[in-house]
Amino acid sequence: MRGAQVRPIGVIRSRIISREQAPKQGSEGAPDAWLEVKPSLAAALDGLAVGDEIIVLTWFPRARRDTLKVYPRSDRRRPLTGVFATRSPDRPNPVGLHPVTVRRIVRNRLRIGPIEAIDGTPVVDIKPQLPTPNS
């Protein structure tokens, strides 16, 4: 298999600055944040509107890529579980998936939330949430 190449399209600007500050999920008290899209890609935002539900895909540069099993939600009372059966950021390809709402649009910047990503997290893609799978 050939190596895949993914280039960031933007970055998250958040008041969360460490893994310890980040909630496990966006729905668990995460703040809103700015998603700054590279100016050269701003035209790709055409069609997005305030109130849209989108999925933001991020790359977790601080994640451990050699982790194969974790205690779900860091709870050692639970059994060790393969990372593909969890939402752990530590995994062979540390891609984050964040369902968020567009709160504001200013040129190449989207105010989105709630999102548990750390300030400086690279964004690799944005996709609309569709009413039904595969629509």
What are these regions (language model features)?
Residues 1-99, 103-135:
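Glycine-rich, low-complexity intrinsically disordered segments
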